């Protein structure tokens, strides 16, 4: 299993002033950094790729969809724009020689409904992601569906729903991205959800129930690592916690969950590596 860190441990938006975070992640013993692509016009692929290559370091990318990129919108023009944006994210991922792109890429992040999601909304999402997946296949990029909690999406809250959407898309490079923070709200069992993802699992966010330092809260880490060991997981796993509360993120973090990003990484990594050792990962 490859252990990394989400850049939001230190920042609230990615741009060229954050390039040194790549060096910092490597110094702290990480094997990759997860880079957010929410603001693509500030993402300098050449600069990021150059820094990664100079260090021999790895990366993956992620994003969420907004009003103007919602591929479950009833407006065909917005769905088309969402497909265009996701393709641009895939291209940016390939441009930095990364192979994994994931997140809330199936519907607008934070969308309120009057009722349950409809078959039409699932179909719009699947049709759009199928087009993106076909484009991504030519660039060697996998796409991960990340289930998130009921307060952040109406479409995919559980691993079971993510697998259902994957089957609708019907492309091999569509994979599953699990997140323990969201699983703690929506799943009956960390173990069962991880086993269900199985060979389709491509990325795992290792978060405490309050998004604080892993190992300091309520998450059942033995359940998680037992399952990861049983499926022989060798993919990406990133600490994802938000220490900088001052930016433009919808993270709903109103207090310091760790003294700083470095403490989050060092203490969280120490705990996660102890669990990896315990379960032979």
Which ranges hold each PLM region?
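Histidine-acidic metal/acid-base catalytic patches
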Residues: 1-7, 11, 15-27, 97-99, ...
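Active-site-proximal loop/turn and secondary-structure-junction residues that shape catalytic pockets
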Residues: 9-11, 37-39, 65-68, 105-109, ...
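Anion (oxyanion) recognition and catalysis
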Residues: 26, 53, 94, 137, ...
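Structural motif corresponding to the early beta-alpha repeats
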Residues: 31, 35-126, 234, 238-248, ...
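Generic enzyme active-site microenvironment
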Residues: 32, 144, 176-180, 238-239
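Active-site acidic/histidine proton-transfer and metal-coordination neighborhood
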Residues: 77-175, 258-264, 270, 279
